[in-house]
Swiss-Prot record:
UniProt-listed Enzyme Commission number(s): 2.7.1.39
Species this protein is from: Rhizobium etli (strain CIAT 652)
Catalytic reaction equation(s): L-homoserine + ATP = O-phospho-L-homoserine + ADP + H(+)
Protein name, as recorded: Homoserine kinase
Pathway: Amino-acid biosynthesis; L-threonine biosynthesis; L-threonine from L-aspartate: step 4/5
Biological classification of the source: Bacteria, Pseudomonadati, Pseudomonadota, Alphaproteobacteria, Hyphomicrobiales
Gene name per UniProt: thrB
SUPFAM superfamilies xref list: Protein kinase-like (PK-like)
Length: 321
């Protein structure tokens, strides 16, 4: 979450009047994340999250995101719910941006997740994949294999400013993945951004998943690879196989991976590492100074990508074959 667009208190009060949400008591911006402008509101009824959708988010995608949250919650997944306006619409407008009010989810994200937490995340991810079955709206993944080269071209000219030799290395990686990317694996709705700051815990109990604004239709095992990258590496860059084992066992306790998915996991993990490297690289080079946003180091994901190149089998991630 982040803040790119400021809001005036009078405008916010007018916006709230379109909802049965009580009167405004206080509000503050939330700096974490990189996509939308987010605020924590306290009203006379309940705490809420206000999201202003910035230019990177297509307005035509919003019915998918908001409808998916409703669909998943109706099937028992703990996730935020969009609040309807008095006229029944889920979307309004504030400060020249599409805007929505979302229910507040209790919990905090973990700064130092342990293996037991990774197991819970794996289980919750599989539950989301199962619950997403039957959701009728579709959204292709613009940040998967077909979109990476276009994204790379936006940063390629300056890439060697971040690390010498990057241009050559990433061109080669794109060529490899274009040839090796698996086809025909089980697909469905994926979260596509299930990082620690998008999973809330109360103590050791997972209390919910948040931030569905990258959700889309893609390979389910690709979502698993995103979580391996996001949860199972230590701050020194080392892969923690104990966490990986817990993550994969948790996932398979709900939805067992097929043999084809298991065989593809090293390539999928290279791809998901490249995806986050590319978006971080672009943001690193283009985010304006002074924006109330946390920029993330692209080289973290370059190191993960290099790790995955050395992997020969999913057993090296901790998966029992």
């Amino acid at each position: 979450m982040a803040v790119y667009t400021d809001i005036a208190e009078d405008d916010l009060k007018w916006f709230l009047s379109e909802y049965d949400a009580g009167s405004l008591l206080s509000y503050k911006g939330i700096a974490e994340g990189v996509e939308n402008s987010n605020f924590l509101l306290h009203t006379s009824k309940e705490p809420l999250i206000l999201t202003l959708y910035e230019k990177r988010v297509e307005k035509t995608d919003l019915p998918f995101f908001l409808g998916l949250m409703q669909h998943l919650a109706a099937r028992g997944l703990s996730c935020p719910l969009p609040l309807p306006r008095r006229d029944g619409a889920l979307l309004g407008s504030l400060s020249g941006r599409p805007a929505a009010l979302i229910s507040f989810l209790e919990g905090m994200w973990l700064r130092k997740p342990e293996a037991k937490h990774c197991r819970e995340v794996g289980r919750a991810l599989a539950q989301m994949h199962v619950a997403g079955d039957g959701f009728e709206l579709k959204r292709p993944n613009a940040l998967s294999i077909d979109g990476w080269r276009t994204l790379w071209e936006k940063s390629e000219a300056r890439a060697d400013e971040v690390e010498p030799g990057l241009q050559h290395e990433i061109r080669g990686e794109l060529d490899f993945l274009s040839a090796a990317w698996p086809k025909g694996l089980p697909a469905g709705v994926i979260h596509a951004d299930l990082f620690p700051d998008n999973v809330f815990f109360l103590g050791d109990q997972l209390s919910g998943l948040i931030d569905f604004y990258f959700a889309c239709n893609d390979l389910l095992a690709y979502d698993v690879s995103i979580c391996l990258n996001a949860w199972c590496f230590e701050k020194d860059g080392a892969y923690n196989i104990t966490k990986g084992t817990a993550m994969l066992e948790g996932y398979q306790s709900v939805r067992p991976l097929s043999g084809e998915e298991i065989a593809a996991l090293p390539v999928l993990s290279r791809g998901s590492a490249l995806r986050f490297f590319l978006t971080r690289l672009y943001d690193w080079l283009t985010t304006p100074e002074g924006a109330m946003v946390t920029k993330k180091d692209p080289l973290e994901y370059l190191r993960k990508l290099r790790f995955h190149r050395q992997i020969g089998s999913a057993a090296e991630y901790g998966l029992s074959l």
